[in-house]
Amino acid sequence: MTLNRVVVTGYGLTSPIGNTPEEFWNNLHDGKIGIGPITKFDNSEIPVHNAGEIHDFPFDKYFVRKDKNRMDQYSLYAIYATLEALENAKLDMDTVDRDRTGVIVSSGIGGLQEMQDQIIRMHEKGIKRIQPMFIPKALSNMAAGNIALRIGARGVCKSITTACASSNDAIGEAFREIKFGYHDVILAGGAESTINEIGIGGFNALTALSTT
């Protein structure tokens, strides 16, 4: 069996210290700190007051307003990073075999903000008022699914959920898919958006977050 060489041809990201690889690297090199006071919710009742929020996410570059209604924030982050990676790689999807192009993008939790919002909505307005897109927005595999739909990839499409190792496992699985000839191209990585009451509150209850 001939094993294929596997290479990284492009990369993209959104983070508290940059939304392009160049910006991220320069800020990292210069010692810029992306951790700061939590602004997304009132955290006065818990001892955790700092987090790595993304304040300048360039939503308008790839999305329209209705995308917020059908995708959780973590999916938007994942799609943005993917499209940036394709641009970085100068990869035209019309030049690849879409049936041999896959997406393995993981999330440890998935659409946690949507889960929180809909649970509150249910308690305030009743079970019949849960919004139809709740499940598609909340599922942890929907970042991968939304990416595949956006770029037209028809190969493997999955999410590997292994807590904090989820993205690392996705990259390893992508390596295997290409190495052994199952696919030619894999978009691999991970995304998360859990800076909210239930996310920070939950990890605080676990005593897994710094209080300084």
Stretch-by-stretch model annotation:
Residues M1-D67:
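ACP-dependent fatty acid/polyketide chain-elongation machinery
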Residues T2-L3, P16-N19, D30-G36, E87-D99, ...:
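Acyl-thioester C-C bond-transforming condensing/cleaving domain
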Residues L13, M71, I160:
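Generic anion/oxyanion-binding catalytic loop in active/binding sites
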Residues E23, Y74-A81, S166, A170:
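Generic hydrophobic secondary-structure packing signal
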Residues K40-L91, S140-R154:
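A glycine- and small-residue-enriched flexible loop/hinge segment at structural boundaries
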Residues S106-G108:
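Short loop/turn motifs enriched for small/polar and acidic residues
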